[in-house]
Swiss-Prot record:
One of its GO terms (biological process) is symbiont-mediated suppression of host type I interferon-mediated signaling pathway. The DNLP motif has IFN suppressive functions like binding to host MAP1B. GO terms for cellular component: host cell mitochondrion. It comes from Human respiratory syncytial virus A (strain A2). The gene is 1B. Keywords: Host mitochondrion, Host-virus interaction, Inhibition of host innate immune response by virus, Inhibition of host interferon signaling pathway by virus, Inhibition of host IRF3 by virus, Inhibition of host IRF7 by virus, Inhibition of host RIG-I by virus, Inhibition of host RLR pathway by virus, Inhibition of host STAT2 by virus, Inhibition of host TBK1 by virus, Inhibition of host TLR pathway by virus, Interferon antiviral system evasion, Modulation of host cell apoptosis by virus, Viral immunoevasion. Monomer (instable). Homomultimer. Heteromultimer with NS1. Interacts with host RIGI (via N-terminus); this interaction prevents host signaling pathway involved in interferon production. Interacts with host MAP1B/microtubule-associated protein 1B. Plays a major role in antagonizing the type I IFN-mediated antiviral response. Acts cooperatively with NS1 to repress activation and nuclear translocation of host IFN-regulatory factor IRF3. Interacts with the host cytoplasmic sensor of viral nucleic acids RIGI and prevents the interaction with its downstream partner MAVS. Together with NS2, participates in the proteasomal degradation of host STAT2, IRF3, IRF7, TBK1 and RIGI through a NS-degradasome involving CUL2 and Elongin-C. The degradasome requires an intact mitochondrial MAVS. Induces host SOCS1 expression. This is Non-structural protein 2.
């Protein structure tokens, strides 16, 4: 009879909750990855150099966000995410303040799934 069997082997941790992350959780996470200090700096630079009004600045913000989203996830997932964003209004919208004709993006308005985010709270 074999007596070399030892019950002291470490057990592997079993993960029982294997549900996929919800799309809203993924989008929230992606938004936090995309919108960084560098992203806001680029938007503010565009606002100053091109003297954008609020509508133009918001459009510039969203175009840059979508380009970064597309680059990050690829075209197939991008289509799914933008359909979801459009349907549920989860696109991050910028908050601008006006400095005597020059706009500055100071943060992101809250959406259904994300809190208000100020540029000071963002990852560098």
């Amino acid at each position: 009879m074999d007596t070399t069997h030892n019950d002291n082997t470490p057990q592997r941790l079993m993960i029982t909750d294997m549900r996929p992350l919800s799309l809203e959780t993924i989008i929230t996470s992606l938004t936090r990855d995309i919108i960084t200090h560098k992203f806001i700096y680029l938007i503010n630079h565009e606002c100053i150099v091109r003297k954008l009004d609020e509508r133009q600045a918001t459009f510039t913000f969203l175009v840059n966000y979508e380009m970064k989203l597309l680059h990050k996830v690829g075209s197939t997932k991008y289509k799914k995410y933008t359909e979801y964003n459009t349907k549920y209004g989860t696109f991050p919208m910028p908050i601008f303040i006006n400095h005597d004709g020059f706009l500055e993006c100071i943060g992101i308005k809250p959406t259904k799934h994300t809190p208000i985010i100020y540029k000071y709270d963002l990852n560098p």
